[in-house]
Design a protein with these regions (language model features):
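Charged, often flexible domain-edge or linker segments that flank or initiate folded functional domains
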Residues: 1-317
Length: 317
């Protein structure tokens, strides 16, 4: 990962011409969309574990809007910190509040402890919540003074469930893992194209360019699946999601028709799809599949025949 060099700034990348600009915006849009999916999924799992109390009364559209608001808050903070509008560079702010330094801190922890350990911690999410509150309400402390900026973007009462606040007075921050926060920050700070990873700077990025990068996110929303849905391999940014019952019905029509259906859905060749169906599923992939299926053995057995067709998330699961 390269940072701070000429050409690494997002504004420089966007200035390279219409074709390059489209490549950058498409790639960033894809990265951020995957991160949004992860955070939406995390809140869904926490809501399920809380017996539907965490998101009680919260509609699907509001969940998506709340998660998208988190991403836009992060973009705002990156821009503000890099323009010197906050206290980036001061020890107290850098260690406990800055979003620009948080990613490296989490990467250091992951290197020392492994990313899996980050799954069991949620201090980074609490730090983000504190920073969001700080920007909205301000801070008056002898070692750190920040005016209250207010505004709707950082208003904590727009999406109180982001903080774990519920109508009954419950106020416990949701356990969004440090690993997920790391992936959120990575999606915004690092442009990944093939084997190249380029650290981005938001310095001098104007509102129009931010809107150009993220406008595609407004075309999406979140829907709660009422039956098992499998995310299949496919063209990046256009990977299909198909319900398990449909896949099972297509298999029943015969191998040739099933492969033809998969070709239409994934864009892969019939030969490549045939190879995926024929190759043995390795033990590690089956282990991950069992984890995803939880205690539902019947679901695991139903999904198992399609294991090699399922795409991995950004965690490699």
């Amino acid at each position: 990962v390269f940072g701070g060099e000429p050409g690494s700034r997002l504004v420089d990348l966007l200035a390279k011409g219409a074709e390059d600009q489209q490549d950058v915006t498409d790639r960033l849009g894809y990265q951020v969309r995957r991160a949004v999916e992860e955070l939406v999924g995390a809140f869904e799992r926490l809501d399920r574990d809380s017996h539907r109390e965490l998101l009680k009364g919260v509609g699907e559209t509001e969940v998506y809007e709340g998660v998208l608001t988190v991403m836009m808050r992060l973009v705002f903070l990156f821009c503000a910190e890099e323009r010197g509008l906050l206290h980036l560079g001061e020890d107290l702010y850098d260690r406990f509040y800055a979003v620009s330094t948080l990613r490296e801190q989490l990467h250091d922890d992951a290197s020392k402890l492994t990313e899996e350990v980050l799954d069991r911690r949620s201090s980074a999410w609490c730090r983000l919540l504190a920073t969001f509150r700080m920007v909205y309400q301000g801070v008056a402390h002898e070692d750190l003074r920040i005016p209250a900026y207010g505004g709707t973007l950082f208003d904590p009462d727009r999406f109180p469930w982001l903080e774990g606040r519920q109508a009954d007075g419950t106020n416990e921050p949701p356990h969004i893992s440090d690993r997920i926060v790391l992936h959120l920050l990575d999606s915004l700070q690092v442009l990944r194209q093939g084997q190249e990873a380029r650290k981005l700077s938001f310095h001098a990025l104007d509102v129009e360019q931010i809107g150009h990068v993220y406008e595609g996110l407004l075309d999406h929303t979140a829907k709660r699946a009422l039956k098992p849905i499998l995310g299949l391999v496919g063209k990046e940014g256009d990977e299909p999601e198909v319900d398990l019952e449909t896949l099972e019905s297509k298999v029943a029509e015969g191998r040739d028709k099933f492969i033809a259906y998969l070709k239409d859905q994934t864009g892969k060749t019939e030969r490549a799809l045939g190879n995926l169906l024929d190759q043995a599923t390795d033990a590690e992939k089956l282990r991950k599949l069992r984890v995803v299926c939880g205690d539902d053995h019947d679901l695991f057995e139903r999904v198992k025949p399609f294991a090699n067709l399922i795409r991995e998330d950004s965690f490699g699961n």
